[in-house]
A protein has these predicted regions:
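ATP-dependent carboxylate/acyl-activation modules
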Residues: 105, 289-291, 405, 409-411
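Phosphate-binding loop of NTP-binding sites
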Residues: 8-14, 86-217, 226-235, 386, ...
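Acidic, Mg2+-coordinating active-site environments of NTP-dependent enzymes
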Residues: 68-74, 181-303, 324-328, 353-361, ...
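A glycine-rich beta-strand to alpha-helix segment
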Residues: 388, 392-416
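Active-site beta-alpha connecting loops in nucleotide-dependent enzymes
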Residues: 48, 288, 299, 307-375, ...
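N-terminal leader/targeting and accessory segments in enzymes
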Residues: 1-89, 93, 323-328, 340, ...
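Buried hydrophobic packing segments
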Residues: 87, 118, 122, 147-148, ...
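Generic hydrophobic/aromatic pocket-lining and core-packing "Φ" positions
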Residues: 55, 170, 205, 209, ...
Length: 416
């Protein structure tokens, strides 16, 4: 954090009393599974779990202090009326006191990969551990707050990912974060259940630009028809618009990352050329588990694990990657796409038709579809291995992709 790690300093930020002895702490943790000795345990209440139920476990793991909504006799603790609002106040303090460049990345696809590429590139211009990136896909309100708590005095640059699945969420996150660089990777058919259509996605995602500092820069990759809406929110801020291209997603994410670097005052004077070797290194670093991850499975079959999430655009990005591969047999195993609303069946069938133009066989697990094709089958998940057994060899590539709730990563394990 951006303060000396003493409990008394923490309690002053949120104007709460510290009960017990003052002491030093390592960090604030909300999960007893990952916390270490000396951490503070913040007992959050969520829809599925109540952190107060894990207080004894936190103490067993050596928590230096508890932040709770109830008294804990005999222990060192800070009592607050609402632990989530306590977290919010800490996050607000962190943001107000972080005076370095802050980058916020959103978009229908490519947020995490762009963040990873940008992180690897910017590290070259700073000393060790001076660039911060939000962990994993911590892109909702809770994730943003927890990410902000990890900022410390050594950081010279911070890169955050923010997401949405309902109207107003980007506005809420961006107004809290107040970045000086805002990045919109693309506009696509994502979260239509909450955002209705691509126009709703455009309206929601471009809200980021309204909260970029007035002297900051807004970067966006979008079709010509989407630029007017972006301009309305960018106003007099600097802007960089990148064209939508028929290239693989990595190339587009790399181009965006390079454009961001050109906007950073500390870095833009540094010209650098990326060798083929370094680009291959970036490709490996940009791979997030479950996102176009190439694996070698049973009998040397090529597996593409893209099971983390799915929408029509991310399906097509995966199709492009596999189209360029020289394997004899190309198979797509797909599951449902969530949050597409009333257009689910239509968009799903469009994706299936696109898949049939690339793959020799398309297997859909528990999907509804109007598509009739000899190379398309709707099957039960229990029948997947039987249908693919003959393709388990080095001449085959199998793509596995679906929305997160399908848990298709369990199916991928059958073929590893």
């Amino acid at each position: 954090m951006l303060i000396d790690h003493k409990l008394s300093n923490l309690s002053k930020i949120v104007n709460c009393d510290l009960i017990g002895n003052d002491a030093f702490f390592e960090k604030v943790s909300t999960d007893t599974r990952s916390m270490a000795e000396g951490d503070i345990f913040l007992a959050l209440k969520g829809p599925n779990h109540n952190g107060h139920d894990f207080i004894n476990k936190a103490l067993d793991k050596g928590a230096s202090c508890l932040i709770t909504e109830k008294e804990i006799p005999g222990e060192t603790y800070i009592k607050t009326e609402n632990t989530f609002l306590f977290l919010e106040e800490l996050a607000k303090f962190q943001r107000l006191n972080f005076k370095q460049d802050v980058i916020a990345i959103t978009g229908s696809n490519g947020k995490t990969s762009t963040k990873e590429i940008l992180y690897q590139l910017t590290k070259n211009f700073f000393e060790n551990k001076e660039v911060f990136k939000s962990p994993g896909n911590w892109n909702n309100k809770l994730g943003l707050y927890l990410s902000l708590l990890e900022l410390n005095k050594n950081h010279k640059l911070a890169i955050f990912e923010i997401g949405t699945n309902a109207v107003g969420e980007i506005k809420e996150l961006a107004s809290f974060l107040k970045p000086n660089i805002g990045v919109l990777t693309n506009i696509g058919n994502s979260h239509l259940e909450g955002l209705k259509d691509t126009q709703g996605v455009l309206e929601e995602k471009t809200d980021l630009f309204s909260f970029v500092s007035l002297k900051g820069t807004c970067l966006m990759r979008a079709k010509e028809k989407h630029l007017q809406k972006a301009e309305e929110k960018i106003k007099k801020r600097k802007k960089i618009f990148l064209q939508v291209k028929e290239t693989q997603s990595f190339d587009q994410n790399l181009e965006m990352a390079e454009a961001v670097i050109s906007c950073l005052p500390k870095l833009k004077k540094n010209n650098f050329l990326l060798s083929e070797e370094y680009i291959n290194f970036l490709k490996k670093k940009a791979v997030v588990p479950g996102r176009q991850e190439l694996l070698i499975g049973k009998n040397n079959v090529n597996l593409i694990d893209d099971t983390y999430n799915a929408n029509p655009e991310s399906f097509r990005a995966a199709f492009k990657k596999i189209k360029s591969m020289s394997c004899k047999n190309k198979i797509c195993v797909m599951g449902k796409m969530n949050e597409l609303g009333e257009k689910t069946l239509l968009l799903q069938d469009e994706v299936i038709e696109d898949a049939l133009s690339v793959f020799d066989l398309v297997l859909a697990i528990d999907l509804d579809s109007n598509i009739k094709d000899e190379n398309f089958k709707i099957i039960d998940s229990k029948a997947i291995y039987k249908n693919l057994e003959i393709y388990l060899n080095e001449e085959s590539v199998i793509l596995f992709k679906a929305s997160r709730s399908v848990k298709m990563e369990k199916i991928v394990k059958l073929f590893k």
